[in-house]
Every structure is written in C-alpha cells, then in structure tokens.
Amino acid sequence: MHFFYPPIRMDLVEISYPDNVSKNVLERTKTISKNMGRSVVVLKKETPGFIVNRMLAALVDEAYELYDEGIAEFEDIDIAIKKGLNHPLGPFELSDYSGLDIHYYAKLKKFEESGDLRDKPKTFLKEKVLKGDLGVKTGKGFYKYNKE
C-alpha cells in the first residue's frame, strides 16, 4: 500500500499486486483502504514509483530541464502547471515539500544505475542540497518558508 503525503489531504492509495500475492489479500487490502475513505488503484506489476510518482517524475524532470535551459523561471513554470494543468502545486513547490535532498538522491541513484546523462541530477539541485536549502523542512528551497 502506498499512501500520499499529506494523507489527510490526499485520499489515493496505490496497491501493488504482484503474482505471488493471493487475490484474497488484494481484496482485503482494497476493503481496508476503502473503509478508510481512500480511492484505490491497483498495479498489476511492481514498478519503481508506482503510478503517480512515475508520472510525476517525468513532469518534474521536464520542469527542471526548462529551468536549467533558461527557458523560464521556476515560479513561472509552477504557475503554468497550476493554471494550465489544474495541479494544486507546481513541480518546484512540490519538490520543496518533498525535500530537495529526496529528489537529488533519487536522481543520483537512478543515474548511477542507468549511466544515462538524462538521469544525472541538475547542478542547481546539487548546489541547493549542498547549501542545506532542502525546501520546507529547512525554511528554504526554491521558495522561502517561515519556520514555525
């Protein structure tokens, strides 16, 4: 079962259903999730990132590429995604909430496994992580946050 953060706002649960899990376990897991008021999606095969994070990674990668190429400022990319795709957060805001260190190390791991330069973390992301600007949890990432 994969819940989303923050769970009080995000009602989706992704359930991975590999071949070695019984149909009974799947049905019980779906029932438990629905009893918690969750929407349920089932993956027939395991995949890194499940459905949502795999799709989201492509969006964030493109946003980072647009910013890195100097095509648009990160604030404008966030506005475009929020207004144009009706997302509640833009990719840079979401990165700040997830933690820039999480994004950096996930990309680094993927790059180490694939060797594909497209998977290499962007320099601007590495610089933010090295400076300790990790997003909401440190009060600064792409945006500044009031630490309470």
Regions found by a protein language model. Name each.
Residues M1-K44, N53:
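Rossmann-fold dinucleotide-binding core
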Residues I8, A58-L59:
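Alpha-helix N-cap/N′ positions at the starts of helices
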Residues E14-Y17, V60, Y64, F111:
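A broad detector of the eukaryotic-type serine/threonine protein kinase catalytic domain
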Residues Y17-P18, I51-V52, E113-S114, K120:
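A generic structural signal for short
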Residues K23-R28, K34-K45, Y64, D68-E69, ...:
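NAD(P)-dependent Rossmann-like dehydrogenase/reductase catalytic/cofactor-binding core
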Residues N24, F50, A58:
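Short alpha-helical
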Residues P48-M55, G70:
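Glycine-rich phosphate/pyrophosphate-binding loop and the adjoining helix
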Residues V52-N53, D61, S95:
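Residue-level micro-sites within transmembrane alpha helices that shape
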